[in-house]
């Protein structure tokens, strides 16, 4: 939220003549400061290397499935982060789920626990990895996971469930939306951790 506020104020003050690229990572308090600076600096470089700069790289690096290359999966133009991740994916999940640390309990919302969000993230990462290999097994797995969540039709959460299935099915069709959903899930995990 702070990073977005800083970016918006800079754009306002400079009439969009100066852009900002950033690297954002979260660390435990005991993590060495020199390593924090190094990782965040690498993330900033990744953001600056994004086409046209004016980007943000989030969370850190992953090793690809071969273990050969470190990649940052969460790199966005600022407007894409705001519009596609926060105002679309995160907002939709907020409307459909009770998320500890983000919203209040409502009878019409499904409960989102850490186990479910981590499983969803694992399957989304699998879908993104599968695309490069032409496989589709994780699409089937995510649809199976959603089918197991289905409440009875007279349950007040049934409408939220139907909307969730429709949204996720639509989002996993494109790499961009799938990646944005994964980023939104990561943000939810960090919000949930913040409640402790």
Identify the function of each model-found stretch.
Residues 1-196:
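Charged, helix-rich terminal subdomains or tails
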């Amino acid at each position: 939220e702070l990073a977005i506020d800083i970016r918006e104020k800079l754009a306002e003050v400079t009439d969009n003549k100066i852009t900002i690229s950033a690297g954002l990572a979260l660390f435990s308090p005991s993590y060495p400061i020199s390593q924090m600076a190094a990782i965040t600096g690498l993330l900033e470089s990744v953001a600056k290397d994004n086409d046209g700069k004016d980007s943000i790289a989030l969370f850190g690096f992953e090793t690809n499935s071969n273990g050969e290359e470190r990649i940052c999966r969460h790199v966005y133009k600022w407007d894409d982060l705001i519009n596609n991740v926060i105002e679309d994916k995160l907002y939709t999940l907020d409307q459909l789920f009770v998320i500890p640390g983000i919203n209040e309990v409502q009878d019409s919302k499904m409960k989102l626990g850490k186990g479910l969000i981590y499983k969803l993230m694992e399957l989304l990462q699998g879908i993104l990895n599968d695309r490069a290999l032409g496989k589709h097994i994780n699409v089937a797995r995510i649809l199976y996971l959603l089918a197991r969540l289905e409440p009875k039709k007279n349950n007040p959460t049934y409408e939220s469930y139907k909307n969730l299935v429709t949204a996720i099915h639509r989002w996993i069709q494109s790499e961009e939306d799938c990646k944005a959903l994964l980023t939104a899930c990561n943000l939810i995990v960090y919000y949930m951790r913040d409640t402790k």
